Amino acid sequence: MELDLSVLGRSFIVTRRNSSITRPCIQSSNFSVRVLQRNKHRPLCFSTNPSNSSFIRFQKGCDFSHRCQFVVLSATGDHVGISQKHSDSTEKVDSIRILLKRGIVLGAVVCGVLFYGCGKVLASTSVVDVAFSKSILLLKNAWPKTSQVLKVLREQGLILAVLLGLSAFFSMAETSITTLWPWKVRELAEKEPENGVFRMLRSDVTRFLTTILIGTTVVNIAATALVTKAATAIFGEAGVSAATGVMTVAILLLTEITPKSVAVHNAQEVARIVVRPVAWLSLILYPVGRVVTYLSMGILKILGLKGRSEPYVTEDELKLMLRGAELSGAIEEEEQDMIENVLEIKDTHVREVMTPLVDVVAIDGSGSLVDFHNFWVTHQYSRVPVFEQRIDNIVGIAYAMDLLDYVPKGKLLESTTVVDMAHKPAFFVPDSMSVWNLLREFRIRKVHMAVVLNEYGGTIGIVTLEDVVEEIVGEIFDENDSKEEIQKKTGYIVMRAEGIYDVDANTSIDQLSEELNIKMAEGHQYETVSGFVCEAFGYIPKTGESVTVVLEKENWEENDEQDEGKHERQDQKEKHQIYRLEILAGNARKVSAVRFERVSDMDQVSEARDVKNMVPKFVRKWSSEEDSDGNLQAKNAVFDEHLIAETESMKKE
């Protein structure tokens, strides 16, 4: 075949795609090349033909059946170097085919050598009988059994090899199919023609697995029965034990471990090879497969078990795949976090993302629009809750954009109240509502702000569309946000020294647990560090107050195999971490900042009088101000007794 190269330059690409060749034009230069050799493991080499400078001539016998690219590397002198690029999947399929071919050849060679050797040994029986002397009488007595074993191997060895080979084939097929994710099979099937192997697999996976299991069972039983029959004929009852041991080792090594290891590491390529033969076999075994399927379904019904349709990929599997994609570099860590946030948004409640009422900036509805303008200049909020009489009595939402309608009407700015301009009524949502449903309501109602109510109908905060979006993409700031507002919104954890952290009270408890590598008690009712600190103290602490708490380490795993009596104290020491909490800032209503200082000296802990074990029990030292019933001494005695027991057990090894 010949190609006109009058439009090609000295650097060009010839691409093989579905029996057609494309030639991108680069520059005008006339020359021709002729195929000298073709080897898929080496670059193709072409040479110019001075007699005809406008054609490439390919020799007969050149195989272009593979999907590949030929790229001109150089065109100097009389030779042009061409490199061939195979896709990764094609190379893997070829490697699997080569592996299978080598396995078949190796098995054939072993069988041939075995049969040839058995024939030679059996032919030399008479010579052996003459050559044996009395000194090796024991070996001569064992020779008849050995001769019988060799004879059986010669007669039935080929059948046994075929059965073991089929068993290995079925094991590879089963592992390759079950290893592929359902979504991966679907993806591969969509890229194939109608008669593609993965389309066949996707159409009825159960039929393939049933066929494989039937085939595996039949060939393994047949191989075991064949060996057992021969061993029993030679060794009698002892042959059963010998056959069991030999077949156990043979099946494990030759038909289970080795084939399945190959299939696990090359699931896609192995499946591409084995699916079609299994499909043909399933047509033959279809009646048997249907009977087995009906029987298994009947047994499940008798046991009270019902099959249920599962999604292609569960949420946990999807998160696992996202983690693998992030580790492999396919996606960024931020992309992984965003996708996981979308998956978790249905389980997130409004109370977890809302702005609490104590932090809400609202305006009195009785004020004029001039007051609202001054309010907007100060806070720069585009939407402001409007209340009447009390901050928790929110009646509507005022839009700063609506002020533009009153600018031409100067007198109305003073005579019109904010409540008259506000959009009423406000959109109210329960605090238990999921963020996913809230987002849907925002889209339906075309609003960006809602008032959050508790179960008693009291206002506890507001939530905006920005709060919902931030649950997915992370915190969003604009040019008007000050440093204080950003810290108030996100919280912060600053490491002052080794084991010393300054933490903003608005920091989420999950962020604190991750940073300090600690685990909070299950079922806790707080969302921020402020709630944790208040629970640790038992009241709202003042600036300068401190308390020592015992927390559980996040990465600690209990070793059940250890002797409980001998290692209990050592386990407690490794399991828990002690922190001293000092209030850095706060007021009568809330805590603003707190310092976490890790305590490693157990003697210092023993001298402390205010240790509180946050996991799993909660104990505290009572102060004189809280002694309402006059039992201060009795209360502290109970505390001291518990404190001594806890600290001594953690101090001793």
UniProtKB/Swiss-Prot annotation:
The chain crosses the membrane at residues 103-123, 157-177, 208-228, 234-254, 280-300. Gene3D superfamilies: 3.30.465.10, CBS-domain. It is a multi-pass membrane protein. CDD domains: CBS_pair_CorC_HlyC_assoc. Coiled coil: none annotated. It holds the Pfam family CorC_HlyC. InterPro entries: CBS_dom, CBS_dom_sf, CNNM, FAD-bd_PCMH-like_sf, FAD-bd_PCMH_sub2, Ion_transp-like_CBS, Transptr-assoc_dom. Keywords: CBS domain, Chloroplast, Membrane, Plastid, Repeat, Transit peptide, Transmembrane, Transmembrane helix, Transport. Residues 354-415, 421-479 form the CBS domain. Residues 149-335 form the CNNM transmembrane domain. PANTHER family: HEMOLYSIN-RELATED, UPF0053 PROTEIN SLL0260. This is DUF21 domain-containing protein At1g55930, chloroplastic. The lineage of its organism: Eukaryota, Viridiplantae, Streptophyta, Embryophyta, Tracheophyta.
